[in-house]
From Swiss-Prot:
GO terms for biological process: DNA recombination; DNA repair. The lineage of its organism: Bacteria, Bacillati, Bacillota, Bacilli, Bacillales. It comes from Exiguobacterium sp. (strain ATCC BAA-1283 / AT1b). SMART domains: HhH1. The RuvA-RuvB-RuvC complex processes Holliday junction (HJ) DNA during genetic recombination and DNA repair, while the RuvA-RuvB complex plays an important role in the rescue of blocked DNA replication forks via replication fork reversal (RFR). RuvA specifically binds to HJ cruciform DNA, conferring on it an open structure. The RuvB hexamer acts as an ATP-dependent pump, pulling dsDNA into and through the RuvAB complex. HJ branch migration allows RuvC to scan DNA until it finds its consensus sequence, where it cleaves and resolves the cruciform DNA. GO terms for molecular function: ATP binding; four-way junction DNA binding; four-way junction helicase activity. InterPro entries: DNA_helicase_Holl-junc_RuvA_I, Hlx-hairpin-Hlx_DNA-bd_motif, NA-bd_OB-fold, RuvA, RuvA_2-like, RuvA_C, RuvA_C_sf. Its main location: cytoplasm. This is Holliday junction branch migration complex subunit RuvA. Residues 141-145 are annotated as: Flexible linker.
């Protein structure tokens, strides 16, 4: 099994990166390939070697924690490697764990390729099994029931305003403990972004 691949980024496209490891180019499918575009130095990508009878694919992650989440998602019926990669790419790990633990289908169905049936299956298969990914996890009782949909709407508004996923993730983390209206979330987020 390949634990990680280390080397300079030789090529970046929308689906994968190519790492030059001692003159051999490794094609690695990663959650957010353009994250690597800015890095000229050697990078370490923690990998999952996916083998099927007709293909072998390397999936790569910035941390072991991301890779472990990917592996856990693969164990869910109805989620394949592309779906698991999309979930890792588009979600905050702590918020995802909280949604699974609280069985928040509304949050889980926002991920690409996840419908109500798959969201229920995720909660059923993974609830209580993600503690090693979040050792300090404390359930946010009521967070998703009260305020989360407003925060989601505010984040969607920030996307429409042209803010990057990275900027929105930082703001979301800062605002996740507050319970506000959508308008108040947007105002507060803009204040944080313009500092």
């Amino acid at each position: 099994m390949i634990e990680f691949v280390k080397g300079p980024v030789a090529y970046v496209c929308a689906e994968y990166i190519t790492l030059d490891v001692s003159g051999v180019g490794y094609k690695v499918h990663v959650p957010n390939p353009f994250f690597y575009r800015e890095q000229d130095e050697h990078v370490i990508v923690f990998t999952h070697h996916y083998v099927r009878e007709d293909q072998q694919t390397l999936y790569g992650f910035r941390s072991r924690r991301e890779r472990e989440l990917f592996n856990k998602l693969l164990s869910v019926s109805g989620i394949g490697p592309k779906g698991a990669l999309a979930i890792v790419a588009s979600g905050d790990i702590d918020a995802l764990i909280d949604a699974i633990e609280t069985e928040n289908e509304k949050y889980l169905t926002k991920f690409p390729g996840v419908g109500k049936k798959t969201a229920k299956q995720m909660a059923l298969d993974l609830k209580g099994k993600l503690s090693e990914l979040a050792p300090d996890y404390v359930p946010n009782e009521g967070l998703f029931a009260q305020g989360a949909s407003e925060l989601d709407e505010a984040c969607e508004a920030l996307v429409a305003l042209g803010y990057s996923e990275r900027e929105i993730a930082k703001v979301r983390k800062a605002l996740s403990g507050e319970i506000l209206t959508t308008d108040a979330y947007i105002k507060r987020a803009l204040q944080l972004l313009l500092k």
